[in-house]
């Protein structure tokens, strides 16, 4: 019995402990759950706040990117608008020039019509005189015939012969009048046809007409680069001018450097040299010389490509490489202020179109027109450029028609074919554009500068000569091994004396002798 009671008590105690433990455990579990929920809620709030912050940061970043992209697009748009406005202004300028040209042509046509009207009146007057003379002649012949009939002492043969002579004289008079009328009609018809051909050729081509300038503008990123271009005590500018033969002008104009030279080829090489230096960012005498040599090679490629492009555009086949090179050099020469290559292409187009209208060989006309001024880019010669070009092209087995047209376009040789007349006429039309006459002064100045350089090159030991400062200074580079310092002083005096005796110039000209000696050794 005691055992049963003990078991019962143990079971009851176990139940009590189980119930108490159950509620105690539930209580602690509820406390722990509540704490976890609070922590989860706090974590959720923190995550939401972090997400909102990241979203705001991302939004701000994207807004900045969009703003930057918009500003970039706006700058590109503004730049494009500026370029289009400039092109539009150029087109307007070309249209105004063409309007002036057409107005001049209309004035010439009206003057020609006036002259034709005067010639018609004169022809009418002459026709009336011829008719009057013919009537008088008929009256005289009639009187003589009547006298012959009344004279009985003439034999029949004599009377017959006199009548025949009178009829022959009348026939000759009528024939002369007919020939005169045919000649007048043929002349008028030829003038109309020539005028039509010329106007048709002019209307079918269009070339820009711009006077070449002696200045080139190079844009730089900032004015800070001007100091680097000048160099310490101006040594970079001196090295640049000695290497290129071009004046470099650094003034207060923002982000601009100006190159000045009468020779377009030297000016273009100097421009390319300066652009290479600005891209590399390294500017000193050695870098200048290297950039100049690189630019010189690139210009040679540009010359060949320009010649090939001109030949291709005119569809002229089979041109030797030496001639192609000279045609490319025309791009860097001027005639009456006009680019020589553009002028030659214009003459070739005009001559070719007129030859096609006249059923002549258009390819020969275009070839002669393109090469008619090739003598201007040949080395110095005492012959006129037309004869020099003709003699130079003889070694390439050019057609005699082409050679004659080239040599005769300034009258040095007699024209031997219609092609020569067409090339001469096309050359006159091209040089008669508005503004060509005003460019004669600039062309004369260029010739004067070239003559100054040529005078200095005649002395022994001279390597290069450059006319700078619009001809106010001649810079002469001599061989350091062959010309000493004392000889350089004498050479400067001799050059100045020869310029005084042979050249005409305003003011005074400074002669500067540059003598440089380089010693090179290699460490092995």
UniProtKB/Swiss-Prot annotation:
InterPro entries: HD/PDEase_dom (IPR003607), HD_domain (IPR006674), HDIG_dom (IPR006675), KH_dom (IPR004087), KH_dom_type_1 (IPR004088), KH_dom_type_1_sf (IPR036612), Ribonuclease_Y (IPR017705), RNase_Y_N (IPR022711). GO terms for biological process: mRNA catabolic process. One of its GO terms (cellular component) is plasma membrane. The chain crosses the membrane at residues 2-22. Gene3D superfamilies: Hypothetical protein af1432 (1.10.3210.10), K Homology domain, type 1 (3.30.1370.10). It is found in: Cell membrane. Residues 340-432 form the HD domain. Its main location: membrane. Pfam families: HD, KH_1, RNase_Y_N. GO terms for molecular function: RNA binding; RNA endonuclease activity. It comes from the Bacteria. Residues 214-299 form the KH domain. Its EC number is 3.1.-.-. Disulfide bonds: none annotated. Belongs to the RNase Y family. Endoribonuclease that initiates mRNA decay. This is Ribonuclease Y. It comes from Chlorobaculum tepidum (strain ATCC 49652 / DSM 12025 / NBRC 103806 / TLS) (Chlorobium tepidum). The gene is rny.
């Amino acid at each position: 019995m005691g055992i049963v009671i003990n078991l019962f008590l143990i079971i009851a105690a176990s139940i009590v402990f189980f119930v108490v433990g159950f509620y105690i455990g539930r209580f602690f579990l509820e406390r722990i759950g509540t704490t976890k929920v609070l922590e989860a809620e706090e974590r959720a709030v923190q995550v939401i706040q972090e997400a909102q912050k990241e979203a705001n940061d991302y939004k701000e970043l994207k807004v900045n990117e969009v703003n930057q992209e918009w500003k970039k697009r706006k700058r590109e748009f503004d730049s494009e608008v500026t370029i289009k406005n400039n092109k539009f202004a150029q087109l307007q300028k070309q249209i105004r020039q063409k309007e002036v040209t057409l107005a001049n042509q209309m004035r010439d046509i009206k003057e020609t019509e006036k002259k034709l009207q005067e010639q018609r009146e004169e022809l009418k007057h002459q026709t009336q005189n011829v008719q009057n003379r013919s009537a008088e002649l008929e009256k005289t012949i009639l009187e003589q015939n009547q006298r012959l009939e009344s004279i009985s002492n003439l034999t029949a043969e004599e009377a017959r012969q006199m009548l025949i002579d009178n009829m022959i004289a009348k026939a000759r008079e009528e024939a002369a009048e007919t020939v005169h009328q045919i000649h007048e009609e043929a002349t008028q018809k030829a003038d109309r046809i020539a005028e039509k051909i010329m106007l048709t050729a002019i209307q079918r081509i269009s070339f820009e007409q711009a006077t070449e300038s002696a200045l080139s503008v190079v844009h730089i990123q900032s004015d800070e680069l001007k100091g680097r271009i000048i160099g310490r005590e101006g040594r970079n500018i001196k090295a640049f001018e000695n290497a290129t033969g071009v004046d470099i002008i650094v003034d207060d104009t923002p982000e601009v450097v100006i190159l000045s030279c009468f020779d377009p080829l030297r000016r273009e090489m100097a421009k390319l040299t300066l652009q290479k230096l600005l891209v590399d960012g390294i500017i000193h005498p050695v870098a200048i010389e290297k950039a100049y040599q690189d630019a010189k090679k690139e210009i040679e490629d540009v010359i060949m490509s320009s010649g090939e492009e001109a030949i291709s555009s005119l569809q002229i086949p089979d041109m030797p490489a030496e001639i192609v090179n000279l045609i490319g050099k025309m791009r860097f020469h001027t005639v009456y202020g006009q680019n020589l290559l553009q002028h030659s292409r214009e003459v070739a187009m005009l001559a070719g179109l007129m030859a096609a209208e006249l059923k002549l060989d258009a390819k020969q006309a275009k070839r002669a027109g393109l090469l008619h001024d090739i003598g201007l880019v040949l080395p110095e010669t005492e012959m006129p450029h037309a004869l020099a070009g003709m003699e130079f092209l003889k070694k390439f087995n050019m057609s005699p028609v082409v050679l004659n047209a080239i040599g005769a376009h300034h009258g040095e040789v007699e024209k031997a074919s219609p092609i020569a007349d067409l090339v001469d006429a096309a050359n006159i039309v091209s040089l008669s554009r508005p503004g060509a006459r005003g460019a004669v002064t600039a062309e004369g100045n260029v010739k004067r500068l070239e003559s100054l350089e040529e005078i200095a090159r005649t002395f022994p030991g001279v390597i290069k000569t450059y006319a700078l400062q619009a001809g106010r200074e001649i810079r002469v580079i001599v061989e350091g091994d062959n010309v000493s310092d004392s000889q350089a002083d004498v050479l400067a005096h001799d050059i100045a004396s020869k310029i005084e005796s042979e050249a005409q110039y305003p003011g005074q000209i400074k002669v500067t002798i540059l003598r440089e000696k380089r010693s090179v050794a290699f460490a092995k």
